[in-house]
Amino acid sequence: MARLRSMVQAGVARVEGFGLAGFSDEELYAIHTSTLEVLEYTGLKIESQEALEIFSEGGARVDFKTKVVKIPQYLVEDAIQSAPSTLVLAGRNPKNDIVLGGKRVGFINFGEGVSIIDPYTKEYRKTTRRDVANITRFCDAMDQMDAVLRPVAPQDIHPSVAVVHNAEVIFNNTSKHVFIGVEGGRNFKKVLKMAAAVAGGEDKLRERPLFSCNICPTSPLQIVNHASEVIIEGARAGIPVNMLSMGMSGATSAITLAGTLVTHNCEVLGAIVLSQLTSKGAPVLYGSSTTIMDMKNMTAPVGSPELGMINAGVAKLAQYYNLPSWVAGGOVDSKIPDAQASHEFTLTGFLTALAGANLIYGAGMLELGITFDYAQMLMDNEMARMIKKAVGGISVTDETLAVDVIKSVGTAGNFISEDHTYAHMRTQSQSKLVDRSMRENWLAAGAKDFTQRAYEEAISILENYTPEPLPEKIAATLRSIVEETEDEYGVARSLI
């Protein structure tokens, strides 16, 4: 008989519990038809000459002078149909494989930060290559992070070779599936070569892609050259590409959230059309980091209720198209791991999980997605566990209704010693960090708050956790690719 399960990893079981409808069928259809109208009559600006030619040969109306591509309805709908509805994102260790699609819910860390709060000194500083390694290793230890996104940008590495340094460090420090920003076709080929070495060859990598790429259309309604290169090369290699639009309502998209979803949808579907025209059936994710423009502070807040609303809406659009989704949720605007940070993570993380988003990214980052903090990462991991538990819902079966047990205990009894209780007690949520004890026990343990406990646990993980290592020969191959790339760009050797 069916039983509740806690700590469900993305892809292990489909989350079918509590949910959020968000839109009526008529409203989803209205967003869809509005999108088709804009794509066909306004179009997208595409910088890449190769992409323009692919669109033209595929049947789109292309103005090579203005670089505007107008995409007819049938091409959009053909692309939606040919893109896979389910993706298996492989980990270096198959136990870490995850499945995206339907309403499976998973979490992943936020990425691309440029600063960090040191867990020992609480110093605020710029990020380094060593930080990329340490945070990746830390995320590998987080049991509720279902994959790993490049967490921060190393400020001590020359920008032209940062991508290969990131890839080397990440492949060495996690056996989960990884998302790596490659920033163009040339770097994509380098990372592909590295991933093939890890996988045991390009054929094996195509069968089990160990990494995915993120590309960001430029709102409103543009796809720049390096993004097109990654879409095209990813499609040819069978590597999943996440079409991650980053519109800002009121600035780079309409002030109304429905209007923002239209431009967002245009950008993502346009990128998917390019992918499918390049290679039919190429793996893609329907992505989003879209939010609002805070008109008072002139910022793009990631902890706003509107971010949760927009990205829950994006999850529903992805389900409407039967495409795997990746959405922003759980990131925070607070500068330190405080009550504001916890409220913001829970608000947007819960909204997007209830909507059935497949991968929700935002964990571990403060300051509008700029600053990584280890305590925040641990606290977010705990909240992700609770959110997964909550959205799993309540199983209603003969076993869980427990009528026979209730009748046996009768009035004024208790259920503590019942076999039924022992059989199901492990389905209750538990947490190492969240305090549920009585005050006297809390005082005896040092009267520490959530953040203090998280920093202590973070330091313990940093000092004691070791990820599954790469074989020495493969690690040496990755190092040689990094050095080869440094030579090609004329960059001096970077210290490891």
UniProtKB/Swiss-Prot annotation:
This is Trimethylamine methyltransferase MttB. Belongs to the trimethylamine methyltransferase family. It is an enzyme of class 2 (transferase). Keywords: Methyltransferase, Pyrrolysine, Transferase. Catalyzes the transfer of a methyl group from trimethylamine to the corrinoid cofactor of MttC. It comes from the Bacteria. GO terms for biological process: methanogenesis; methylation. The keyword Transferase applies. It catalyses: Co(I)-[trimethylamine-specific corrinoid protein] + trimethylamine + H(+) = methyl-Co(III)-[trimethylamine-specific corrinoid protein] + dimethylamine. Coiled coil: none annotated. Pfam families: MTTB. The keyword Thylakoid does not apply. The lineage of its organism: Bacteria, Bacillati, Bacillota, Clostridia, Eubacteriales. One of its GO terms (molecular function) is trimethylamine methyltransferase activity. Its EC number is 2.1.1.250.
